[in-house]
Design a protein with these regions (language model features):
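Serine-dependent protease modules
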Residues: 1-215
Length: 215
C-alpha cells in the first residue's frame, strides 16, 4: 500500500531531484545537477509515500506535493487500486518532508494498513536495504542495495545528513520508504545524483530525522 501523489495543474513533476526553479535550499541543490528549463505548460507529477497510521496519514517528500492544487493517492488492496484525494497537513521545505492525509467520505471508517517508522540510529554501512516506490509510474517497484554511507552531506539544506544507498532510486521514488532487513522503515528516499536516472548513488532521509519533524 504505497500512495502516488499527483501534482495539480500548477508546477512540474517531482520524482528524484525536482525540476522547477525555486530559492529554497533543496531546489538550489537540484538545479545544480538538473539544469532543466522552466515549465511552459501545466503538468502532473508522480511520487511515492507510505501510510503511517490507520487514519490514513501519509509521509512523503515536500517536493512531491509542493504547490499542488490537488493530491491524488492510489492505494492497492486485494489486487485492486482505489483512488482517494488527500489534504496537505504540514510540510517542512528545509528537511523536504511533508505529511498528507487521505480524505475519507462521511461514514467511511476504513482503517488503512500502515507502516511504522523504525530507528535509523544503529544503521551501519554495508547493511542491506530495500527501496519501494513508484519510479516512472511503475508502482510497487522493489530495488535492493546496501547502505553506502551515513551522515552524507550533499549541500541540500541545514539538515543535511542523508543515508547514501546504491539501491536503485529514480524519478518517482521520492517519498517512498527505505527498509532494513528486519522490515523496518529506516529512511525516506529523496534524491539521486545523476541526470539520466539511477547511477547507484541515492539519498534517503533517516527515519529518526523524519520522526522529529512530524512529532
Amino acid at each position: 500500500n504505497f500512495p502516488a501523489p499527483r501534482r495539480g495543474p500548477r508546477g512540474g513533476p517531482r520524482g528524484g531531484p525536482g525540476q522547477d526553479k525555486s530559492p529554497d535550499a533543496f531546489r538550489d541543490f537540484y538545479d545544480r545537477f538538473f539544469n532543466e528549463r522552466p515549465n511552459q505548460k501545466p503538468k502532473r507529477g508522480m511520487g511515492s509515500g507510505f501510510v503511517i497510521d490507520k487514519e490514513g496519514h501519509i509521509l512523503t517528500n515536500y517536493h512531491v506535493v509542493e504547490g499542488a492544487d490537488e493530491i491524488v493517492v492510489m492505494l492497492e488492496s486485494n489486487g485492486k487500486e482505489k483512488e482517494y484525494t488527500a489534504t496537505l497537513i504540514g510540510s517542512d521545505s528545509k528537511t523536504d518532508i511533508a505529511l498528507i492525509k487521505i480524505n475519507r467520505k462521511p461514514g467511511d471508517n476504513t482503517e488503512f494498513p500502515f507502516l511504522e517508522l523504525g530507528s535509523s540510529e544503529n544503521l551501519e554501512v554495508g547493511e542491506w536495504v530495500v527501496a519501494i516506490g513508484n519510479p516512472f509510474g511503475l508502482s510497487h517497484t522493489v530495488t535492493v542495495g546496501v547502505v553506502s554511507a551515513l551522515g552524507r552531506s550533499i549541500g541540500a539544506g541545514p539538515y543535511d545528513e542523508f543515508i547514501q544507498t546504491d539501491a536503485s532510486i529514480n524519478s518517482g521514488n521520492s517519498g517512498g520508504p527505505l527498509f532494513d532487513m528486519n522490515g523496518d522503515v529506516i529512511g525516506i528516499n529523496t534524491a539521486i545524483l545523476g541526470k539520466g536516472g539511477s547511477i547507484g548513488i541515492g539519498f534517503s532521509i533517516p527515519s529518526n530525522s523524519a520522526k522529529k519533524v512530524i512529532d
